[in-house]
Swiss-Prot record:
One of its GO terms (cellular component) is ribose phosphate diphosphokinase complex. Belongs to the ribose-phosphate pyrophosphokinase family. Class I subfamily. It is an enzyme of class 2 (transferase). Pathway: Metabolic intermediate biosynthesis; 5-phospho-alpha-D-ribose 1-diphosphate biosynthesis; 5-phospho-alpha-D-ribose 1-diphosphate from D-ribose 5-phosphate (route I): step 1/1. Signal peptide: none annotated. This is Ribose-phosphate pyrophosphokinase. Mg(2+) 1 binds at H134.
Amino acid sequence: MSSHDGLMVFTGNANPALAQEVVKILGIPLGKAMVSRFSDGEIQVEIQENVRGKDVFVLQSTCAPTNDNLMELMIMVDALKRASAGRITAAIPYFGYARQDRRPRSARVAISAKVVANMLEIAGVERIITMDLHADQIQGFFDIPVDNIYATPILLGDLRKQNYPDLLVVSPDVGGVVRARALAKQLNCDLAIIDKRRPKANVAEVMNIIGEVEGRTCVIMDDMVDTAGTLCKAAQVLKERGAKQVFAYATHPVLSGGAADRIAASALDELVVTDTIPLSAESLACPKIRALSSAGLLAETFSRIRRGDSVMSLFAES
């Protein structure tokens, strides 16, 4: 009996190309489901094959349009539950609303990441797979198992393949030091940190570089790139301090608000991302943006969960 017997993968409209890659690696067909809209825009999901007793994975990033993709995911999970699926795992490579994970200084704001966690559990999700959560503590918002996997093996593999000379890993802020230090250790290279601070109110933010960057090939490591404003400014500052080249590696290409044009016109030599979020036409047209596939990592994660094997051992050396 194959270890993939009983394993089924379904997807919504967020990233069907990634789902197709995953099932191709697993050697199984993509689950048959109709995901459409009623005339008033409401989402309709119909599961079009037998899932009774099956181990079902729903692959759906909650990227833009965030609310549509989130509702598709929850409605599909409910449809699968009512069709008697044996176990339902939501594979959410990019977990939307993750940046709203706390109340800063007791501001009157929602902790939206917790709201989303509650909604997914109520819908019937029994396990979560996500990749490079913006805040690790979001795992604690769930009362079900959460496998937060890392894109490090993908990004690290590309860095080793590129074999950049005089490599220096740069953390874009103090909060990213742990991630950047781990990468620097794997690459056996030095680490620099960008310390962003605002000297006083109504004064522009200043970037200070902690570390020697002159003559080095700098690699900025982050979990996501959104508008790319800070990233492009960091690349400019590094070049002004004498860096030969500046590359950026990030897991999630949110790339909103004209980010592709900003990157194209910046001092950044290249931005390397994964395909947890499909690239827009503007991003695909940008010669400085390159995407790596996360399908192999996701397929192996699905397979290990199906077999009952360790997932974290995938990252023992990352």
